[in-house]
Every structure is written in C-alpha cells, then in structure tokens.
C-alpha cells in the first residue's frame, strides 16, 4: 500500500471493541497526526464482510470493497502495520441475525440456506460459510505468535489481585474425554518429500470413488496429517458421561470451539444435544425434521423453529423439553436467570475461555439455580484435554494460585499460513457412508488413509516448513531475551507431534542456544512443569502449536491477570510487517447489552493501548520515524500511570466507563509527551494539551459520566449507525474540543 506517510491500519470490528473505537480512534489520530503517521481504518466487521461478499445483490451505494482480502494481501508485505481488534467468529445463529438486520436496513441479501438445493443456493451457502467461524484471523496471521503479559500489567495484577475461588481437595470436578476412536487416537502423519499436489478421495465399500477435495498444492517438507472422530464412539461417550454425571451428582458441561472449528465442532455439539435430549427427539424427531431443526445449532434451534407452531402444540413440546431436566443431570448454565444452558447454542461456551473461567472459580460452573457447583467438563477429543485436568489436580493438591506471587507463561505459537487444526476447515468432511478416505498425491500414491463409518468426521491438517523454522527461531529469540526456560509442548506419542519434534530437533542447532534451557515435553508434563514453576513465582515460555497457542493464551492470563484481554499479542509477519492483536478475549456482547440498557460501556481498552505502543515502536524501527518511538515510549509510560491510578472502566453505571478511561489515557499520554526530552517539538506541542486536559478533568469526567443512565441507541447491533454511535461515544464537548483542535 504505497503512501507518502507510513500507515497504521486500525480495524473496525464488532460489538464492544467496535463501540470503543468510536471514542479511542479520534484520540489516536489526533496524537499521531503531527508525527507524519497515517492511522487509517478497514472494516472487517461481520456485517461489513457480508456486505463485501454479496455485491451482485446490492445497489451501487451499498457496495463496499473486501477489506479482509485487502488486509490479507497487505499482511504479506514489509509495509504491513495492522492493529487487529477482536471480531465475531460467527455461529450460524449470529450469521442469520446479521443477515436479518441488514435486510431490515434495505440490503437485499439472500437468506442463509441451511439446505442448499439449487446452484444459486449452493453458491450463496458457500459464500456465507466462508464468512462464518473464525474467518478473519487465518487470513491476517502471516506470521507466528508472540504473546505475553507486559511488565506494567503483571505488576498491576500483583498489586491489585483479582478474585480466585478457593479449591477443595474433595472437589468432584474433572475433565472427561474419549479413550479411543477420537482425533488423537486415529491420527496419522507424514512429511512431504518434494512439492506435489494431493486430493482427498472417498472410496466406498463398493469401490466407488468420490472426490471430497480436488487437487491442491503441498510444499516440500510440509507436514500433513489425517484423523477421524468416530460417530458411534462419540455418541457412546456422551451416553456414558451423561449417566456418570448423574451418578456423581455434578453439573454436566461440554466445552468445544464451534466458532473456529466451524465444520467439526458444531457436529460434535449436535450429537451431545441429541443424546442429552434423546427422549424429546425420539418423540418429536419427525416434526423437527419437517421444521428444519438443525441440532448443530443447539437446542435453541428447537425453540426457534417451534415458535410458529400452534400454542398448545408448542407448549407440549416445551413441557417435554423441561421434563428432560427431571431425569438427566443438571446442565452448566450460560444464563441461569433466562434458562440458557450450555447446550443452547454452540457459540456460548467456547473451551479456551470457558475452562479457565471454571478453573478460576474453584473448578465450578453455574447450576440452573444460579449456584456454583462441581462440574464434569466433557472435552471429547484427548489431544489437549489433559492440560485442564492437570490444573484441576494441581489446585486440588495445592489450592488456588495467588495472583500476587504467581509466575507467568508467555507463549510462542505456531500459527503462520493456517497451521494445523485451525487451517483444516476446507479439509474436514462429515462422511455420508462407510469406506475409506485417502489423501492421494499427483502420482496416484496414497499418502494417508483412514477407515470411516457413516457420520464420522474426517480431518486433514497441514503445516508448512517455513513457519516451523520461523517458530523455532522465535522461541530461541524469546528465550534469549527473557532468560527463562522455553518448553516445546509436543507429544512424541502423537503422530503429528512426532513429525514436528524431528524438525525442532533439526532446526534448534542452527541457533545459538548456549546457556538457554529448552525442553520438549508432552502437554500433560509441560503443564505440570509450568504449574510448579508458576507456584514458585517463576516464568516459563510455552512454545506450542496453533490450538495450544489459543488455549494457553487464555488459560494462564485468566489465572494470572483475571483476563486474557490484557496480553500483549504481537505477530511478527514473515515478510517483515507487523500484526498487533488487542488481547486474546472476545468481543463481549454483554458489554453491548449494558450500553443498550443504560449507556455504560465497561470494555477495557488496555489491549488497544498495548497494541498501539507496539505498533508505533515497529513503525519507528521499520521506517526510521523517530517520533513514532517517542510516541510509543510516552504511551507505555501513560499506560503504566493509567494502571497505577486504577483508571480502568467500572462495571457500574454512573461510574467511569470506557470513554472515561480513554480521557485518562489521553491526559497521561499528553503529559508524558510534554515531559520527555528526546523530541522538543513534540514536548512543545503537547505541553498545552497536557495542561488543558489536566485542568479540565472534573468537567470532562462529569460530562462523560452524566451521559450514562438512559438507554443507548446504536441504530443497530451488527451494523451500527455511525452518526448515532459517534455522538453516543463522544459525549464530552470539552474533551472533543481539545482532541479535534
């Protein structure tokens, strides 16, 4: 993107971070303007991505460019400097709600066809399917991941410890996984020798062949693997664990990643729904089929589809659903007051966030009466479930961790170029018949094959060699910079990991590792090793694949800091650019609900502050813009003062919220710029701003807090009304006058 000035791209996303952007971005643009830095935006919100992908259905004024595709290309260039805020990884219900809202605003978009029969329906469904799930991150992540808690954040957590639930040695909470016929148990893996093309073929019991995925390119030295989740074994697992939860008197919960693993995990979730509510499906299954109920969307889909039935028929089915709770173990609740259970929609309980929350709360989740209770956490596949059981066992023996003394676990994650499971969606298939699935190369040789039954889930993953080399290098770099042990979380008894271990052992000698402690441990042992060190106040770098990158950058920050949104998340892009992610949390729909109810936004923008400082520092290094480094250093100082003076948003209406926190950041940033002695021009420019912001503190905070209370009109949920939200998020005329001057 050739421009005269170096450009930072600030992404427009969804829900709470999107609202916060209306308040914070004008401050960022104002503070950076005189330093020759462009801060531009690109809309990668769910609504924006839908609009961009259906130009043929829209009129000229409604059409917008495909910002995500543009940023994907930018990420491959040395100029890339992208600040990426959390966005919605859409489930089908969220996708449908967005389409409905856009249609109501005059966008003549097609409905999402759950059953695609015609060619047009198939094309529409294919386009929407590309937008759902975690469609954004894999496009932008052209590098590996470096995530850690900045010192200022860690020190704040030690001085202001978050609550940690006490643990009992008698806790009945535990993780349950399959012991056979899951992805872990069936995995086969091979390293490619020489670039080739492969296709994925199904061969039926009768010998008939069907191409599941046409030929696609593989690079030399690429690792590929294939695994199968057996449907019959999965269903038997759910039946056994549901009975066991009842017998043990614990809550039943299911922890999946249906947003990212958008092909496999909703299907697994659907099987759990059908087994738990089996009496209702046995009685009303035919009607549900006629109504188009999709269990993969959760039991909420039953409620949605029966809503239009005659009142007595609807009430009879609802009574049957309620009766299930009399005979089955109680479900963990998402919202006890509204009766929303773990099985309501697949996007409500997401393993990387839900398990750490449970572990922080004495290993308990909420029951239907709104009380915390010991819980069985079902994580069907064994690949990574042991890490959570290890934390449960450790806390039962040693008690809860102490945030004032505990160590940290920064992460170096293998992520680039759609590595491993998180790039497998287009190679994941639900089999319609029994037979074999084969990965066949250009010469007709079968590289990998798996026996399958009807309904099984087949998955192929890949990871390229260049990202692995970059990952090993980043691990050594971080170990050297921080002086703490680095542990590769790889299991030699797992097919894919065995291939990776060979590469790690081959590439490590290429770097200077003298004096560094570098280990390779299976996830269970790596967790145990790290937990002992955490308890002793010691730090340990976790060097992991893509899924554990995701899981651990929630698990340890939530235990250490109370949230994963306060992590510094840097993606050094492989072609020299930088991607700066603002925390590892989601987009906080409940925060938006509070704004709609009482105009109070409790979103904490600390992740944005940290990412912006890292982005400015990167810009300074790459372009030689010395002012950018001064801005970054001053912002770091301001963030430290912001934390020390506890200016993060309150949860309560009438108190400081997101907007007030932005005022304090601006005031402290201006002060730090005015006081620094590296750049006299910036010091002079911000001296007046700093004194004006400081002197007007009382007036500005009053204007910001007094705006709260009445309902906040956003003019939409997925597609916000710019003018309305800008005015709502910038209610202080005093502050605006200084920022816009």
Model-derived regions, located:
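Short, charged, amphipathic alpha-helical segments
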Residues: 683-691
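Extended, well-ordered protein cores
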Residues: 2-270, 278-503, 507, 511-523, ...
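Ligand-binding pocket scaffold of soluble enzyme catalytic domains
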Residues: 674-677
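C-terminal accessory extensions/subdomains outside the catalytic/core fold
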Residues: 720-741
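A glycine-biased, small/acidic residue-tolerant capping/turn segment at secondary-structure junctions
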Residues: 701-717
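A generic structural micro-environment signature
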Residues: 269, 710, 720-723
């Amino acid at each position: 993107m050739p421009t005269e000035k170096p450009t930072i791209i600030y992404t427009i996303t969804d829900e709470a971070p999107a609202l916060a952007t209306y308040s914070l971005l004008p401050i960022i643009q104002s503070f950076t303007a005189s330093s020759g830095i462009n801060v531009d935006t690109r809309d990668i919100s769910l609504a924006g991505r839908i609009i961009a992908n259906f130009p043929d259905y829209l009129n000229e004024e409604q059409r917008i460019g495909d910002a995500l595709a543009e940023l994907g290309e930018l990420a491959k260039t040395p100029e890339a400097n992208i600040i990426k805020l959390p966005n919605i990884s859409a489930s089908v219900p969220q996708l449908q709600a967005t389409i409905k809202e856009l249609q109501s605003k005059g966008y003549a978009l097609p409905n999402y066809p759950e059953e695609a029969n015609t060619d047009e329906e198939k094309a529409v469904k294919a386009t929407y399917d590309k937008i759902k799930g975690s469609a954004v991150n894999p496009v932008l992540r052209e590098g590996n991941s470096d995530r850690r808690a900045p010192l200022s954040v860690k020190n704040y957590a030690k001085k202001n410890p978050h609550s940690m639930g006490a643990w009992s040695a008698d806790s009945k909470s535990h993780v349950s996984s399959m012991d056979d016929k899951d992805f872990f148990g069936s995995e086969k893996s091979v390293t490619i020798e020489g670039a080739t093309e492969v296709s994925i073929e199904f061969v039926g019991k009768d010998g008939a062949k069907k191409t599941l995925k046409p030929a696609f390119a593989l690079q030399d030295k690429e690792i590929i693997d294939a695994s199968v989740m057996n449907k019959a074994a999965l269903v038997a697992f759910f039946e056994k664990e549901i009975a066991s939860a009842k017998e043990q008197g614990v809550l039943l919960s299911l922890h999946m990643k249906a947003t990212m693993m958008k092909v496999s995990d909703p299907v697994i979730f659907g099987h759990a729904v059908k087994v738990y509510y089996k009496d209702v499906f046995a009685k009303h299954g035919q009607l549900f089929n006629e109504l188009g109920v999709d269990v993969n969307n959760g039991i909420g889909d039953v409620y949605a589809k029966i809503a239009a039935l005659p009142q007595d028929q609807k009430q009879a089915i609802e009574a049957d659903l309620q009766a299930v709770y009399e005979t089955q173990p109680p479900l963990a609740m998402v919202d006890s007051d509204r009766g929303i259970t773990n099985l309501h929609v697949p996007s409500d309980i997401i393993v990387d966030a839900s398990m750490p929350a449970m572990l922080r709360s004495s290993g308990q989740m909420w029951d239907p009466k709104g009380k915390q209770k010991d819980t069985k956490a079902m994580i069907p596949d064994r690949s990574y479930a042991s890490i959570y059981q290890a934390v449960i066992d450790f806390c039962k023996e040693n008690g809860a961790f102490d945030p004032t003394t505990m160590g940290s676990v920064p992460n170096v994650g293998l992520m680039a170029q759609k590595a491993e499971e998180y790039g497998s969606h287009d190679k994941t298939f639900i089999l319609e018949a029994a037979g074999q699935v084969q990965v066949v190369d250009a010469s007709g040789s079968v590289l990998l094959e798996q026996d399958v039954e009807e309904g099984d889930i087949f998955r192929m993953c890949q990871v390229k060699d260049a990202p692995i080399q970059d990952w090993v290098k980043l691990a050594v770099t971080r170990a050297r910079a921080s002086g703490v042990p680095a542990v590769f979380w790889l299991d030699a008894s797992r097919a894919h990991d065995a291939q990776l271990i060979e590469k790690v052992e081959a590439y490590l000698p290429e770097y200077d590792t003298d004096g560094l402690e570098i280990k390779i441990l299976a996830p269970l042992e790596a967790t145990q090793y790290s937990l002992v060190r955490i308890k002793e106040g010691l730090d340990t770098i976790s060097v992991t694949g893509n899924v554990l990158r995701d899981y651990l950058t929630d698990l340890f920050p939530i235990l250490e800091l109370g949230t994963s949104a306060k992590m510094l998340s840097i993606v050094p892009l492989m072609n020299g650019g930088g991607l700066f992610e603002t925390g590892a949390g989601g987009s906080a729909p409940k925060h938006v609900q509070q704004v709609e109810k009482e105009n109070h936004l409790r979103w904490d923008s600390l992740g944005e502050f940290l990412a912006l400082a890292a982005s400015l520092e990167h810009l300074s290094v790459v372009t030689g813009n010395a002012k950018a480094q001064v801005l970054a250093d001053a912002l770091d100082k301001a963030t430290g003062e912001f934390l020390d003076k506890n200016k993060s948003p309150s949860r309560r209406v009438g108190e400081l919220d997101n907007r007030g926190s932005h005022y304090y950041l601006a005031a402290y940033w201006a002060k730090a710029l005015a006081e620094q002695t590296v750049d006299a021009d910036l010091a002079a420019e911000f001296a007046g701003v700093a004194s004006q912001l400081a002197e007007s503190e009382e007036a500005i905070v009053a204007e910001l807090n007094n705006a709260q209370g009445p309902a906040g009109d956003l003019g939409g949920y997925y597609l916000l009304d710019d003018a309305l939200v800008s005015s709502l998020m910038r209610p202080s005329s005093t502050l605006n006058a200084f920022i816009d001057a």
